[in-house]
Every structure is written in C-alpha cells, then in structure tokens.
C-alpha cells in the first residue's frame, strides 16, 4: 500500500510544517493545515484496504511520525545550523518534500 504510506508521510510532513507556521504566526499555516487534513482524509479512506492487505494499521502512525520528524529536523537545520550552506540545503530539501506532497493532491 504505497499510497497509504505516501499519504501518511505527507500528513506528517504537513502537520510539522503547519505547527511551525502557526508558532511563528505565518498566514500560510491555515492552508497548510487544510492540506494536512486532506491527506488524513485520503489515508482514512485507504486504511480498511491496508488492513485487508495484512499491513498493521499502526504502520500509518509510524509513517506519519516519520514524515513529521523528517520536516521537523529540516526546519531545525534550516533555522539553527551555523553553516549557511547547510541551512539553505535544508530549506531546499524541505521545499522539495512539501512540493512532492502538494503535487499529489493538486
């Protein structure tokens, strides 16, 4: 169930980004949160099929946590890394990952 994994990972990524945006009062946080909810809805629709395929439903929580941790780490590197090159690289990597998710639902 590659789709379920992608949807869960993207939900986690967007949740981390929306959390950060909300913390700094970024006006895009609401839009990001709506995208997160969209991925959660897609994942919820697939979960019965994931279970039927013999995949533990808890896997979706792990996939979501992986996506959240991935973006949280990149956000940390982007903001706090002493080397500007590493910070730019983290921002670019994060943008690519978020863009990958956004393109799935547009």
Regions found by a protein language model. Give the residues of each.
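Short N-proximal segments of mature Sec-exported proteins
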Residues: 2-51
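Generic hydrophobic-segment detector
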Residues: 1-2, 57
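Compact alpha-helical subdomains of small soluble proteins
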Residues: 40-106
């Amino acid at each position: 169930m590659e789709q379920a994994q992608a949807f869960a990972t993207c939900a986690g990524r967007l949740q981390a980004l929306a959390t950060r945006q909300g913390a700094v009062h970024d006006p895009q946080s609401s839009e990001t949160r709506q995208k997160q909810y969209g991925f959660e809805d897609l994942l919820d629709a697939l979960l019965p099929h994931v279970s039927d395929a013999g995949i533990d439903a808890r896997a979706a929580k792990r996939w979501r946590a992986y996506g959240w941790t991935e973006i949280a780490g990149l956000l940390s590197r982007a903001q706090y890394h002493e080397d500007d090159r590493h910070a730019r690289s983290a921002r670019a990597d994060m943008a690519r990952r978020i863009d990958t998710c956004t393109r799935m639902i547009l």
